[in-house]
């Protein structure tokens, strides 16, 4: 009885205790700390239907403070508490099976089992797990410690791919799918699909209340990381106690801080050397297992025991990677202690002993702001894009069958270290250290960058100041200039050169679209000449020509004189050079026998021969004795002068061309100078006042379209000449002989070739007789069928041509009438007439057409534009420049905030930036502003023609249609002026059709990744047996060669010679260094166009056009065709290229360049010497060696080894080293492709020169990558669309309307001058009659212009407030506006039609604006006729001159007198010269005497002297005169005092 009572009491006690424990267990699970964010973040649901638990653990979290000196008492208490709980639960289940179901019992068994497994793996201290075997027996399982050891060994050793395991680590086939007892969870580094596929099969989670470890089986991941456990026995030595993390130089530790992601990555190369943590949270990746460890204690790594040959051996993970998040609060006081292993003395060559000393690794500390790190030079920032690749270190265990490039480190028996690889046979293991890439995983995926609107001064001038959270690349592009810069939280980037808006791509993918605030008024030299240049711009459409005209009037003749002087001496210089060159080949003159003097040249010798024989001096012509001749000639005072004359003559006569030019300058030089000045003056004047061929609308850096009217005229003349070849003129009686052209018979529809044949057809065919065979037909239908099949057509046609030519010529000669022949020609040559008409029309069209271009092609934000168009629908209403739409959830949001015109009132509705356009007609010229106000407009005005006009009361009802072909460029468009007929009062009602943007959309297919890869080789040798397969290559890109006999004495450890094998391998060590390229194949899909239709500010609609769209706004309907003439497209193959800086930081999203890849090698078809010999078909291949981001199963991805490398023409060999492993050599191998890849980037066609890309992003998702390309053509072959506008029943006010009571009040203006944002004005307008009228304003100042906007004035007690834009080119203190329609308000006073206000305009700031509105340009109206064009240009020129005189002189009359009178006197002086001094000679006798005196003693000009010298010689250059009767008289020709030379003046100095 007592036994039963005792048993019942025990059972009741156990039941009560177990229920409390279960409740506490559930509470513990639900309240588990979510601190394991690195390992898990996905909520999990337990199998219990009524209990929902959140599992936040992914990896083992060791929360207990465990140190190597932990007492056994603490461990015993821990195990007793755990086993007691499970034993009580087990007892309760055995006595009362209905308390928990089978799942609860299985969960209890699993917790006991996991505790045992973690003990055997070394993650928790060893101890007894009570009642585990009994619990397993009830489930039919064997859970003895020996069995569990064997299962763990098999789990980490057996590499059969089909081996799977359950929670008891029992092996089963993959086809058997056991029930997954736990819901899937996230594991750092593992994809969800792999986890769902392998959980509880080849991925096992060992989990207890406080620890979680996830391990991979050997069947899933090859267990190369496990090595025989070796205790490191290093000799103690002295060393530093505290070492900064960036100064650690230990053999057992590789530690580095990634400043871009705030991660401290610790690579342990000797896992038996303990690393102790204090107050840390670390994620440990030991390749086969991953766990998280929190608190203090030694970093745990998996190890197990394996029975081999009857003995148990301990295996441990040879390497592991520990990652510490420096921004985690749990790591604020983290400390790291370890034993630093370094090399000691060298035992033998290549082998050294180990020494050690204890150190504390000083970690970077995070400030409270969590923005900067102490003890880090650069500062630590978080990476902010998942497309970034960060460089780091990776370590692997290399066993005998594994090889690859990298730095090798071999540890033998825990006592020595070698630099060569050795395997377990020598008691060693080898660690390989390589450089790897890891992908950034930002915590915040919505990081953005902010841009300071004011430009900052920097070394390169002006820079953009950009701030962002984290580190990454920022791309700034402007036109064809692209800058990619690495930015860490804050950076300054120079403003790109060129024209156009600025696109900024942040690291996270956010795009900013900026414009420069400085307005370009297209009035040149305003910075230097100020307001004066504005008057020249108002005078002429060619202000530079007008400025040159003024300069030419004042300084033109001086310039012509200077040019003539330079030309004169330049010709003389070239003549001298030619003479000197020819003189070297000529012989000198001989010695004169008579005077005994050496003659200079042949002409001098001839002069001596003609004079010395008569005892005459050849230079002064004086007669003397023979003795006197020899004494006098050499010292004659005239000798040098005569020799200079001869030299000058020879100089000017050597080259005929130069001689002609020289004589021409001398004879007509003054006339040429005056004529040149006058002609240039007239040309400049004509150009200044001539009308322009439509104002050019291109930005200055874009090549403009020229005037093709001359080309059209020449083409028309050629066509006409070709058709007029049939008209031949002869001299027979002066008659024009006409050769007939083609005609057609109206009866038989047969073509006729002559007048004779036509008359024959008219005569016979009317009688139903065939003109060829003369057969009778029943009717005309039968005749027509017969003529088509008549067999005599060909022969009779030839006869008719001959007869027709004779008949026509005879007819014309007989009639003697040219008119008759001309009429025949006109009647019979309709083709020629049509051609002449077409040529004439082309000529007129070429003169009056206007371009629709509106500037350069800056990059567009296509996504924002598309969203904007889709958001602002017809259900929204428009106020000012904001589109308000009903909110879906009653919450307001604003896209593309528009500061300048944004209403400050917050509305509970969606608002979008309005798609407006401002058109400007500036009196100083056209305006061109690089803006982001989409769409800006080049208002090319087209007048509408009306097909019907009806009058109903004071209304005019108009209907009509028009068509326009528009060049497809973003931020451009066309504007129709709906000009009313003569009955309408409105002069114009603009109808705008702006094109916001357009893009060519492509479909892309990824081909491969390539780069300027770096190759590296490694040797491999074994003492006995065969070499490993492919020398241990683990990839498909390596090359290997082996020699089956080991002929080298490798080391002192190899005992035999010729008993082993040697091999060499070579593989890619770094896939890229300076260049990363991705090849794509593209397919053109479509061209999307964002267009808008705008009648007024209240009537606007936008749409994306693909296959034609129709808009309806009131009475106006517009139809748009498909895009046409799409000439420039992307090639079928292209390559995106990224240049990598010295930091080796890569962001695959920011593409720097796009080049054509049509001629590049295709997959597996290149030689080793080409640039793209290395191909990786998946991005996973770039990060396959990374272990700092969690478990890496990239090696299991088949795409990783689908890479390819060409080894054609390459070979490898080796040579022996005494006492060392052999050295590998190679031939034909290019180790790095930097030079080849650089040539590829430079020589291939760069596509951004022909297409402007609005989006160039490489995107990656898992192992797949894609590119988003949206571009537009920038070549001359531009895309076009056709727009058809139809107006049906548009109402305008008639001219009979009378306005009254117009009031303009409350004018307010504010803004800046010479800036893109301009001046914003508001005014209140009302009237008394009619009920509503559209008014327009214009400025009274020429420096201020008003946008072409309408002011709505309505009848009522309160005025209507209207807002409009104003632009000022200069600072002004007062702005006045007047009503354009003032002529319709007869009763209004000038004060009522004019309104003014004082303003304080801000100066232009050097800032950048984002999403702000402004103008691009406005094209001037075309004129109706040439006379009208010229009259308008002349009046504009005159008015500009008048404004200039008023402003700077004060009066037009004074300005005219002060300018025209000197100009007229200057012209008269040029025409009459010194003859204008005749009145002074008559009335002033002293002046007359002075003039006579000067005339007598005037020296000859240099030109006249040369004319006299040349006159003394004949054309052949001989010293002979036809009038000379004696040879002695020849000498007198050179005598200046000869009385026979009449009035020849004395020669001056000879040039």
UniProtKB/Swiss-Prot annotation:
Gene3D superfamilies, per database record: 1.10.8.1320
Tell whether Disulfide bond is among the UniProt keywords.
yes
> Disulfide connectivity?
1023-1216
What keywords would UniProt list here?
Clathrin-mediated endocytosis of virus by host, Cleavage on pair of basic residues, Disulfide bond, Fusion of virus membrane with host endosomal membrane, Fusion of virus membrane with host membrane, Glycoprotein, Host endoplasmic reticulum, Host Golgi apparatus, Host membrane, Host-virus interaction, Membrane, Signal, Transmembrane, Transmembrane helix, Viral attachment to host cell, Viral envelope protein, Viral penetration into host cytoplasm, Virion, Virus endocytosis by host, Virus entry into host cell
The stretches that face the Lumenal side, renumbered to this chain, are 18-546, 697-704, 845-1451
Residues the record marks as carrying a glycan: 25, 30, 80, 142, 413, 848, 1201, 1258, 1420
Site features described as Involved in fusion with the host membrane, chain residue numbers: 924, 1221, 1336
* Pfam families the record matches: Hanta_Gc_C (PF20682), Hanta_Gc_N (PF01561), Nairovirus_Gn (PF20726), Nairovirus_GP38 (PF07948), Nairovirus_NSm (PF20728)
Low complexity: which segments have biased composition?
A: 31-66
Q: Report the record's Gene Ontology biological process terms.
A: clathrin-dependent endocytosis of virus by host cell; fusion of virus membrane with host endosome membrane; virion attachment to host cell
Which spans are transmembrane here? 547-567, 676-696, 705-725, 824-844, 1452-1472
Q: Where is this site: Cleavage?
A: 105-106, 374-375, 662-663, 694-695, 849-850, 896-897
InterPro entries registered for this protein in UniProt: Gc_C_bunya (IPR048791), Gn_nairovirus (IPR048801), GP38_nairovirus (IPR048529), Hanta_Gc_N (IPR002532), NSm_dom_nairovirus (IPR048796)
Q: Which family does it belong to?
A: Belongs to the nairovirus envelope glycoprotein family.
Q: What is this protein called?
A: Envelopment polyprotein
Which species? Dugbe virus (isolate ArD44313)
Q: Which gene encodes it?
A: GP
């Amino acid at each position: 009885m007592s036994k039963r009572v005792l048993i019942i009491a025990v059972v009741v006690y156990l039941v009560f205790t177990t229920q409390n424990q279960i409740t506490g267990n559930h509470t513990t699970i639900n309240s588990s700390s979510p601190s394991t964010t690195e390992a898990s973040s996905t909520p999990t649901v337990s199998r219990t239907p009524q209990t929902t638990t959140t599992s936040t653990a992914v990896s083992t979290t060791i929360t207990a403070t465990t140190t190597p000196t932990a007492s056994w008492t603490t461990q015993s208490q821990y195990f007793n508490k755990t086993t007691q709980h499970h034993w009580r639960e087990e007892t309760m289940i055995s006595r009362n099976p209905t308390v928990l179901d089978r799942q609860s019992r299985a969960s209890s068994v699993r917790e006991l089992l996991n505790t045992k497994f973690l003990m055997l793996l070394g993650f928790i201290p060893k101890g007894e797990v009570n009642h585990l075997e009994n619990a397993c027996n009830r489930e039919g399982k064997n859970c003895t410690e020996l069995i569990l050891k064997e299962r763990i060994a098999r789990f980490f050793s057996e590499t059969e791919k089909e081996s799977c395991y359950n929670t008891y680590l029992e092996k089963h086939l993959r086809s058997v799918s056991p029930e997954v007892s736990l819901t899937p969870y996230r594991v750092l580094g593992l994809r969800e699909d792999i986890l769902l596929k392998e959980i509880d099969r080849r991925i096992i989670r060992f989990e207890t209340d406080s620890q979680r470890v996830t391990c991979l089986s050997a069947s899933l991941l090859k267990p190369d990381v496990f090595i025989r456990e070796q205790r490191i026995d290093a000799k103690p030595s002295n060393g530093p106690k505290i070492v900064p993390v960036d100064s650690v130089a230990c053999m057992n530790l590789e530690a580095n801080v990634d400043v871009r992601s705030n991660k401290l990555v610790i690579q342990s190369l000797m896992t038996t050397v303990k690393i102790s943590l204090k107050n840390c949270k670390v994620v440990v990746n030991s390749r086969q297992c991953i766990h998280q460890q929190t608190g203090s204690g030694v970093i745990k790594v998996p190890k197990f025991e394996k029975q081999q040959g009857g003995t148990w051996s301990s295996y441990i993970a040879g390497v592991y990677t520990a990652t510490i998040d420096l921004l985690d609060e749990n790591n604020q006081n983290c400390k790291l202690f370890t034993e630093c292993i370094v090399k000691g003395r060298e035992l033998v060559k290549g082998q050294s002993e180990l020494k050690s000393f204890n150190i504390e690794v000083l970690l970077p500390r995070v400030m409270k702001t969590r923005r900067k790190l102490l003890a880090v030079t650069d500062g630590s920032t978080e990476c902010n894009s998942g497309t970034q690749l960060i460089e780091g270190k990776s370590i692997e265990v290399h066993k005998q069958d594994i090889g690859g490039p990298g730095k090798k480190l071999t540890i033998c028996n825990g006592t020595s270290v070698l630099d060569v690889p050795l395997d377990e046979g020598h008691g060693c293991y080898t660690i390989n250290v390589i450089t790897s890439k890891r992908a950034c995983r930002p915590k915040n995926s919505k990081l953005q960058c902010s841009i300071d609107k004011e430009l900052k001064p920097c070394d390169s001038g002006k820079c953009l100041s950009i701030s962002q959270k984290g580190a990454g690349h920022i791309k700034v592009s402007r036109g064809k200039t692209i800058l990619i810069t690495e930015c860490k939280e804050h950076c300054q980037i120079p403003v790109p050169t060129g024209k156009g808006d600025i696109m900024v791509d942040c690291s996270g993918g956010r795009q900013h679209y900026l414009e420069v605030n400085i307005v370009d008024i297209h009035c040149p030299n305003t910075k230097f000449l100020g307001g004066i240049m504005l008057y020249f711009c108002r005078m002429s459409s060619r202000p530079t020509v007008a400025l040159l005209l003024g300069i030419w009037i004042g300084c033109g003749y001086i310039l012509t004189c200077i040019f003539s002087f330079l030309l004169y001496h330049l010709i003389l210089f070239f003549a001298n050079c030619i003479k000197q060159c020819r003189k070297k080949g000529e012989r000198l003159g001989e010695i004169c026998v008579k005077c005994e003097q050496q003659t200079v040249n042949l002409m001098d010798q001839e002069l001596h021969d003609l004079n010395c024989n008569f005892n005459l001096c050849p230079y002064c012509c004086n007669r003397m004795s023979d003795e006197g001749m020899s004494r006098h000639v050499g010292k004659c005072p005239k000798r040098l002068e005569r020799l200079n004359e001869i030299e000058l003559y020879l100089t000017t006569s050597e080259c005929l061309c130069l001689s002609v030019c020289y004589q021409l300058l001398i004879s007509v030089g003054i006339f040429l100078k005056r004529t040149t000045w006058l002609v240039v003056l007239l040309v400049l004047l004509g150009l200044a006042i001539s009308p322009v061929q439509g104002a050019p609308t291109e930005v200055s850096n874009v090549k403009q379209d020229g005037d093709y009217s001359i080309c059209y005229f020449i083409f028309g003349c050629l066509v006409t000449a070709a058709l007029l070849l049939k008209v031949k003129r002869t001299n027979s009686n002066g008659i024009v002989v006409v050769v007939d052209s083609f005609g057609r018979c109206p009866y038989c529809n047969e073509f006729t070739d002559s007048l004779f044949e036509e008359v024959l057809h008219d005569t016979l065919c009317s009688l139903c007789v065939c003109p060829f065979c003369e057969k009778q037909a029943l009717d005309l239908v039968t005749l027509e069928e017969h003529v088509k099949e008549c067999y005599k057509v060909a022969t009779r046609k030839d006869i008719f041509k001959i007869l027709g030519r004779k008949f026509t010529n005879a007819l014309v000669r007989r009639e003697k009438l040219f008119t008759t022949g001309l009429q025949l020609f006109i009647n019979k040559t309709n083709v020629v007439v049509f051609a002449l008409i077409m040529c004439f029309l082309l000529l007129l069209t070429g003169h009056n057409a206007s371009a629709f271009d509106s500037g350069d092609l800056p990059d567009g934000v296509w996504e924002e534009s598309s969203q904007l168009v889709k958001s602002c629908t017809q259900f929204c209403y428009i106020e000012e420049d904001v589109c308000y739409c009903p909110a879906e959830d009653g919450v307001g949001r604003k896209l593309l905030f528009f500061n300048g015109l944004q209403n400050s009132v917050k509305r509970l509705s969606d608002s979008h930036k309005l798609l407006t356009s401002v058109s400007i007609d500036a009196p100083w010229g056209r305006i061109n502003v690089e803006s982001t106000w989409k769409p800006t407009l080049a208002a090319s005005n087209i007048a509408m023609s009306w097909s019907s006009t009806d009058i109903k009361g004071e209304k005019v009802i108009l209907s009509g249609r028009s068509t326009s072909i528009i060049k497809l460029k973003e931020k451009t468009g066309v504007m129709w002026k709906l000009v009313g007929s003569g009955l309408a009062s409105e002069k114009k009602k603009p109808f705008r059709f702006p094109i916001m943007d357009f893009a060519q959309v492509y479909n892309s297919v990824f081909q491969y990744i390539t780069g300027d890869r770096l190759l590296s080789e490694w040797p491999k040798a074994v003492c006995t047996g065969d070499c490993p397969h492919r020398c241990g290559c683990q990839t498909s890109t390596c090359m290997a060669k082996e020699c089956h006999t080991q002929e080298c004495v490798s080391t002192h450890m190899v005992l035999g010679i010729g008993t082993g094998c040697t091999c060499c391998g070579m593989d890619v060590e770094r896939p890229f260094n300076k260049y990363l390229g991705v090849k794509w194949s593209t397919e053109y899909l479509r061209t999307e166009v964002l267009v808008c239709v705008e009648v007024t500010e209240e009537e606007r609609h936008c749409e994306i056009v693909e296959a034609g769209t129709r808009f309806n706004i009131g009475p106006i309907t517009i139809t748009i065709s498909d895009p046409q003439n799409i000439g420039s497209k992307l090639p079928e193959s292209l390559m995106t290229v990224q240049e990598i800086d010295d930091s080796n930081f890569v962001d695959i999203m920011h593409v720097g360049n796009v080049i054509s890849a049509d001629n590049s090698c295709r997959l597996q078809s290149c030689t080793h010497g080409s640039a793209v010999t290395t191909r990786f078909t998946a991005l996973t291949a770039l990060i396959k060696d990374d272990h700092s981001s969690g478990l890496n199963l990239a090696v299991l991805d088949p795409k990783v080894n689908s890479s390819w490398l060409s080894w054609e023409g390459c070979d490898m060999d080796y040579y022996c080293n005494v006492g060392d492993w052999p050295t590998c050599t190679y031939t034909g191998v290019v180790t790095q492709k930097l030079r080849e890849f650089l040539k590829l980037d430079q020589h291939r066609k760069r596509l951004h020169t022909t297409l402007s890309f609005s989006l160039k992003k490489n995107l990656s998702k898992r192992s797949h990558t894609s590119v988003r390309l949206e571009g537009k053509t920038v070549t001359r072959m531009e895309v076009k669309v056709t727009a058809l506008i139809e107006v049906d029943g548009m109402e305008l006010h008639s001219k009979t309307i009378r306005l009254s009571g117009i009031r303009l009040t409350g004018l307010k203006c504010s803004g800046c001058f010479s800036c893109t944002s301009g001046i914003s004005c508001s005014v209140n307008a009302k009237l008394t009659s009619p009920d509503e009228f559209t008014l327009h304003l214009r400025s009274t100042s020429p420096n201020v212009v008003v946008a072409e906007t309408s002011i709505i004035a309505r009848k009522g007690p309160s005025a209507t407030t209207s807002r409009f834009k104003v632009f000022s080119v200069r600072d002004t203190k007062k702005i006045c506006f007047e009503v354009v329609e003032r002529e319709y308000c007869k009763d209004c006073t000038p004060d009522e039609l004019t309104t003014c206000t004082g303003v304080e305009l801000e100066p232009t700031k050097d800032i950048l604006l984002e999403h702000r509105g402004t103008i691009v340009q406005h094209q001037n109206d075309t004129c109706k006729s040439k006379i009208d064009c010229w009259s308008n240009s002349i009046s504009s020129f005159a008015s500009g001159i008048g404004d200039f005189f008023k402003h700077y002189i004060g009066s037009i009359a004074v300005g005219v007198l002060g300018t025209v009178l000197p100009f007229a006197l200057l012209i008269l002086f040029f025409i009459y010269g010194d003859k204008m001094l005749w009145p002074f000679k008559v009335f002033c006798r002293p002046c007359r005497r002075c003039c006579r005196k000067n005339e007598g003693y005037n020296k000859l000009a240099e030109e006249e002297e040369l004319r006299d010298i040349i006159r003394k010689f004949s054309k052949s250059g001989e010293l002979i005169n036809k009038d000379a009767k004696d040879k002695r008289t020849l000498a007198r020709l050179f005598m200046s005092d000869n009385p026979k030379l009449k009035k020849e003046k004395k020669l001056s100095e000879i040039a």
